[in-house]
C-alpha cells in the first residue's frame, strides 16, 4: 500500500506542489506516505504539514565554490571534475513523522 512509499523531492518547491496535489486528492501526509525535500526554505515550517527538509549552508557552499574557481584559474586548469562536500543537516518535521 501507500504506507510504504517515501517521496524525496530535489527541492522544497517540488515537494510543496506534490503535497498540495496529494492533499487536494484526499491523501494524508504523513499517514498515507512520507515526503522530504531539499533546501530547508522558510516555507517548510509554514506549510501544513511542516515539510522535512535537508538544510545546506549555502554561504559555505558559495565560499567553497569560489575557492575551487580561484584554484582552477591559478593553475590554468580546464578541468571540471572537482568533487567537493559540505555538511548538511536534516530538519525532521511532520511530513515524515507518522504516528501510525
Protein language model regions, located:
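Flexible loop/turn connectors
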Residues: 1-100
Amino acid at each position: 500500500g501507500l504506507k510504504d512509499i517515501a517521496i524525496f523531492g530535489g527541492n522544497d518547491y517540488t515537494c510543496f506542489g506534490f503535497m498540495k496535489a496529494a492533499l487536494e486528492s484526499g491523501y494524508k501526509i504523513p499517514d498515507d506516505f512520507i515526503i522530504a525535500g531539499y533546501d530547508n526554505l522558510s516555507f517548510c515550517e509554514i506549510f501544513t504539514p511542516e515539510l522535512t527538509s535537508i538544510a545546506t549552508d549555502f554561504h559555505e557552499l558559495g565560499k567553497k565554490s569560489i575557492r575551487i574557481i580561484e584554484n582552477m584559474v591559478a593553475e590554468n586548469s580546464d578541468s571540471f571534475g572537482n568533487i567537493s562536500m559540505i555538511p548538511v543537516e536534516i530538519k525532521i518535521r511532520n511530513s515524515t513523522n507518522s504516528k501510525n
